[in-house]
Amino acid sequence: MDEHVDILDKNGEPTGESCLKSEAHRKGLLHPTVHIWFYTPEGRVLIQQRGKNKATHPLLWDVSVAGHVAAGEKIVTAASREVEEEIGLTISEIDLESLGTFKAVHKISEDFIDAELHHIFLCQLSVPLNQLTIQEIEVEDLALVPLFKFAEETWGLASMGKYVPHGPTYYKTIIKAIKSRT
């Protein structure tokens, strides 16, 4: 869906301008997104396999839930909305624990520069995996993996080509945060 997104300056502050997501990607304009990482008290991480028709990183494993923040939308509202859309789970804003932001710029092609400020949240998964309902156009599959396996596969990037390449610093931040809560 080509929604309007707010444009941010290099420091992540709103410029007061917005445009279609496709234009932001074409021009490499920084815009906000949300990443929500679900975990269980037993130390398992919920990951999603991106849909096969996604423009970027199709069929790679990624953050539990992710999406763009619509123009004028509150960050936590976008996070809650994306969770409900992608995995069919209704959560409250108080369920979200902010880990801060992470700036990422990826040149996908000459006319697609993905410049995003990820607002990262943790959320404890309170239902069994089989109670989640995937949004098939966005998500191919869901899996709960042990944190140690997830760390092994992303920290050292031992499984290059399996996960979206967010980079070791990003993954280390997520892994350490989840580990301290389980």
Question: PLM features: residue spans?
Answer:
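Nudix hydrolase/Nudix homology domain
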Residues: S22, L59, A71, S98-I108, ...
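Conserved Nudix-box catalytic region and its N-terminal flanking loop in Nudix hydrolases
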Residues: E23-V34, R44-R81, E85
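A short coil-to-beta-strand element that immediately follows conserved catalytic motifs
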Residues: T90-G100
